[in-house]
Every structure is written in structure tokens, then in C-alpha cells.
Amino acid sequence: MDANLNTIQLGDCVQAMNALAEGSVDLAFADPPFNIGYEYDVYDDKLEKQQYLEWSEQWIKAVSRVLKPDGTFWLAIGDEYAAELKLISQEIGFHCRSWVIWYYTFGVNCSHKFTRSHAHLFHFVKDPENFTFLSDNLDNRVPSARELVYNDKRANPNGRLPDDTWIIRPADIVAELVSDDDG
């Protein structure tokens, strides 16, 4: 497989990663099927638990193989298998730097329980002492309550890192992408 810089590879994830050179990837983002029983057009999302976990271990090992020593691996997953996939990732050798909750407003409508309106985003690295995080990049900083609300002089004038609960609403993103000039 020809893996050019800044390209998206399309195909079976394990086969596609097996075609990549070992240690050639800076960032891997996985949003695998949640295995919650939905029947999609091209995929039946209802494997037996053990089969799903074995498949997950297979593709997580493939991620580990292609990731550079200082690379980053993000995993987006629902509630059903979040804990299991975190443990599998750690058993393979990944270190969890952050467990982020992504809150969204388009959750599945439920009639017998509270509506689920979040997903889990795990931030993994291979080496807890050698990884890229860009915490000094001002674009990654947000104002703090210490600064905005309390006018506390101890606040970092450059802001602070965001919380581990992210509110991302697709409507907000679309609004930012469409300008008044686009008509």
C-alpha cells in the first residue's frame, strides 16, 4: 500500500495497517463499531462478545505495530465496551493519558432509561515519557474560571488546558464552516 503523507487509508483496518511499515504512523484515530446490535447497510453490528473482543485486540495490536514510539492513539467507543477496550489497549502496552467524555446533543431516544448522550474518547500513547501533546500551543488553551470569574492574579495569562468533558455539537461545527459569503 502506498502510504503518502497526510492520507486516509480506506479498507479493512487490519489489512490496511498490515500493509503499512512498522512505526510509520504519528496519529491513529479509531472509531470502531460499538457492537450494539444495529443492522447497518454493509455491517451487522452484533458479534458475540468474545468474537468482538478478539477482533478488537487484533486491530489494536495492528495500531500498536504501525504507531511510532512517540505516536498517539485515540479510541472513540460507546459504554458497552469502553472498559474492556481500555484494558485490552493497556495489556498491549498503551498508556492511557486521558479518558475524555464527549457530550453530544443527538443521543439515541430512549423510553425506559435516560438518553445516552456521550461517547468515550481514550487518549493513549506508547511511551508515557516520550509523546507529543502540544500543551504549550496557545490554540490548545482556553480561558479559566480563575481568570474570567474570579479575576485571580494566579491565573495563567495564556489560559489552561481544556477539561476532559468535551461538548461538541455538529450544528456548531457546521455554523463555523459556513460563512455569510457562501450563500
Briefly describe each language-model feature range.
Residues 1-183:
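Core catalytic lobe of class I
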